[in-house]
Amino acid sequence: MDYRALGLKVGLEIHIQLNTRRKLFCHCPPVLRDDEPHFRLERRLHISLSELGAVDPAVVWEVRKRRRYVYEGYRDTTCLVELDEEPPHLPDEEALVTALGVAKMFNAKPFDELHVMRKIVVDGSNVSGFQRTVLVAYGGRAKILGYDIGVETIALEEDAARKMGEEGKAVIYRLDRLGIPLIEIATEPMSYSPQQVEEVAWIIGYSVKITGRAKRGVGTVRQDVNVSIAGGAKTEIKGVPDLSLIPKVIEYEAQRQVNLLKIAEELKKRGVASVELSTVDVTDVFSNTKSKLVKRVLEAGGRVVAVKAPGFRKLLGFEVQPGRRFGTELADYVRAWTELGGLLHSDELPGYGISADEVRAVEQRVGVDSYVLLMGVEAAELEEAARVVVDRLNAALRGVPEETRGANPDGTTRFLRPRPGAARMYPETDLPPIKVTFELLKRAEEVAKVSLEGKIAELTSMGLSKDLALRLVKSPHLEKFEEFVARFKSLPPQLIASIMLNTAKALAREGVEVSEEKLASVFEALENKVITKEAVEDVLRAMKPGESAAEVAKRLGLVRLPFEEVRKIVEEVAKEVGREKALGEVMRRYRGRVDAEDVRRALSELHF
């Protein structure tokens, strides 16, 4: 896919939890708990005008679902702020300093005065119905590892409550995560390839982590990706769980937009100007159906309704992403708006147990070339689903609708809700503006002293190649590497890094687990000259639980020969094969038991 020709633009929003002693707007500890919660309470959310006098479209979308929200909390780590029964406290100062420090890293301009804003979020993940956020800096630009990274904004915001599950129309949330400080870094739109965007996302995330002020572990970093192509629309893809998935998400979203534009072009050629809402009850057609799917609905007292989709023949089944068709997009909308599980459409019938005779009977009844079948018990749900389907069919005439979508594990995406509008954010009335003082900026400078390129320079100064240094920084082993270097001072850092990244990786491909304990034992044996570098792989491969590297070397006959013995061996072999061939011959005969440096030294001391 030629992304430049497509006019691909990608923006990133990187959210990283900060490792603070308190939450952002209260003094509760920022810890996640798995023990039984002490209490539960229930809330419902209702539509009201924002302080700007408007209603956000995403709010309408969520509230129409008529959900109940149940919140779980703990008396010793949850307070009235999280329950929206007490005004917020002033923002955590350490979080502010970190955000200002990260802003300095990216040469972003801090605001002189910070204003806490309310961003409407009505999926229940915020008890109040809004998320508090503070814009800290804007207009940053930095060149890091060859990438020109433009930063639109840097913000602090409170993390949402943890979703624990659903019980019918009730959504269960836990309040332990609500209020944990997040730093959000939003980039300018980029024209890089999907793989390069992944690199940029890693650079941004690592730049925050290297400060030592970010939480580590699963769920502490989340990426949102904004994708558009020429003629398409900005689509926000929420919650890409892993950096390695970013290229696929971008590729598949670009592909989806290309295919939606193809559908729009084809509809134009067919002369389809609009789709009117027109439904036909076809329940009686399926009175003797063999389809388990349909039969289950009918036995529950439900109905089957056909929604007319004139002009969409062969387009409902048109693939827009791998394994996902335009009909799948319609089903996503129906699932998001209603309690129905999905739909069937004419391009996939006969199928799902529905016979050719039943299909012909439906076609005769609806009188158009294509249609969508909806099945359900509640009449109101069927009416709502029919309206949603027709709205999406009409949106297809215009090409690509602006949406917020969720990332699937395979990189494809699904519809979540419409893109929010400007009425989503308004000022927090319970907190005063915060002055960005000279003292705060001075403390922020300390945060900004560390950098990704500075860390790579530090590693290369230890003797690591730039490639190995970059791989080490990208790996989860940097901290342990630094511990090993400090502990085993006589070992070259290059050797430690190579064993951790290359040898351990090769063994992992064989199914051999190389723990930190095993590595420490091997490094100790190397430092004490018990084994050679050449023996490391064999020793790690053979090491049993509780066994030391020295014990394994003895068992395998790979204990390093002392220099005096190496000298005698070298002298004998040199006489036998000649001085020039002696090094290779000794290493071949005594593989894993002699060190190459010892052999070279012995050769240099020969007097013939």
Curated annotation (Swiss-Prot):
Lineage of origin: Archaea, Thermoproteota, Thermoprotei, Thermoproteales, Thermoproteaceae
Catalytic reactions of this protein: L-glutamyl-tRNA(Gln) + L-glutamine + ATP + H2O = L-glutaminyl-tRNA(Gln) + L-glutamate + ADP + phosphate + H(+)
Lyase keyword on record: no
Biological function: Allows the formation of correctly charged Gln-tRNA(Gln) through the transamidation of misacylated Glu-tRNA(Gln) in organisms which lack glutaminyl-tRNA synthetase. The reaction takes place in the presence of glutamine and ATP through an activated gamma-phospho-Glu-tRNA(Gln). The GatDE system is specific for glutamate and does not act on aspartate.
The keyword Nucleotide-binding is annotated on this UniProt entry: yes
Disulfide cross-links: none
Pfam families in UniProt: GAD, GatB_N, GatB_Yqey
Subunit record text: Heterodimer of GatD and GatE.
UniProt keywords, alphabetically: ATP-binding, Ligase, Nucleotide-binding, Protein biosynthesis
E.C. no: 6.3.5.-
Enzyme's top EC category: ligase
Origin: domain of life: Archaea
Origin species: Pyrobaculum calidifontis (strain DSM 21063 / JCM 11548 / VA1)
Gene Ontology BP, a term: glutaminyl-tRNAGln biosynthesis via transamidation
Entry GO terms, CC: cytoplasm
Family affiliation: Belongs to the GatB/GatE family. GatE subfamily.
Region of interest: Disordered: 402-422
Gene: gatE
Protein name: Glutamyl-tRNA(Gln) amidotransferase subunit E
GO MF terms, alphabetically ordered: aminoacyl-tRNA ligase activity; ATP binding; glutaminyl-tRNA synthase (glutamine-hydrolyzing) activity
